[in-house]
């Protein structure tokens, strides 16, 4: 980080190089947007084919109970499988999956897909050992550290529903969100480093 405040960067536009554009998944956003406008279901069905599904969908979009739309009805998918698991038996196994840098830029931690998988599985096993099952709600109240990613992915892996609460919120605000969501578990830390200050 350069130490510049984000609000001082408002209005600045960064254009990717031609090399980056050539390797992008979307070459021309205008054509892509028009495709989505003219054939919404076909567009999203094509995008969905990029993921691994445990069970394919019966219908891309169920509009029978507007405005309560249902996407990919009948399908089964796990986002962790698509984010991590499917890469473990490929050349990506030892490629970078997560790069974390501390707020002050003095510390950096990196995780390959293999290492990220190990951390997520460790978290998932701890959560399961604490009695959390599919459909249970988990509140995550962590500072901006890699463990927040591990916790979110661990919840998704076992089918638990997670709610991330900003680490700068007060205990009253946290309690209200825990009560409202009927959370069974709180994942937290003993302190946070936010905007150059330690909060405990």
Q: Which stretches of residues belong to each language-model region?
A:
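Glycine-rich phosphate/diphosphate-binding loops that line cofactor/substrate pockets in enzymes
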Residues: 89-91, 127-132, 176-184
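Short polybasic/polar patches that bind polyanions
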Residues: 49, 128, 156
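N-lobe entry segment of adenylate-forming
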Residues: 1-111, 115-118, 122-125
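Structural core segment of the AMP-binding/adenylate-forming
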Residues: 157-200
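Conserved AMP-binding/adenylate-forming core of the ANL superfamily
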Residues: 80, 98-153, 170, 174-175, ...
């Amino acid at each position: 980080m350069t130490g510049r405040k984000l609000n001082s960067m408002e209005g600045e536009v960064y254009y990717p190089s031609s090399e980056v554009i050539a390797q992008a998944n979307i070459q021309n956003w205008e054509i892509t947007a028009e495709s989505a406008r003219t054939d919404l279901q076909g567009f999203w069905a094509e995008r969905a084919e990029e993921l691994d599904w445990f069970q394919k969908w019966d219908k891309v979009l169920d509009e029978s109970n507007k405005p309560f739309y249902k996407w990919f009805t009948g399908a089964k998918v796990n986002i962790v499988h698509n984010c991590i698991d499917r890469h473990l038996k490929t050349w990506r196994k030892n490629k970078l999956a997560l790069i974390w840098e501390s707020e002050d830029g003095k510390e950096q931690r990196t995780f390959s897909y293999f290492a990220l998988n190990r951390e997520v599985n460790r978290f998932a096993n701890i959560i399961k050992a604490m009695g959390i099952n599919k459909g249970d709600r988990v509140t995550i109240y962590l500072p901006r550290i890699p463990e927040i990613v591990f916790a979110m992915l661990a919840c998704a892996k076992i089918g638990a529903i997670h709610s991330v609460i900003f680490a700068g919120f007060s205990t009253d605000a946290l309690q209200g969100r825990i009560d409202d969501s009927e959370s069974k578990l709180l994942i937290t830390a003993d302190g946070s480093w936010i905007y150059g200050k330690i909060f405990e």
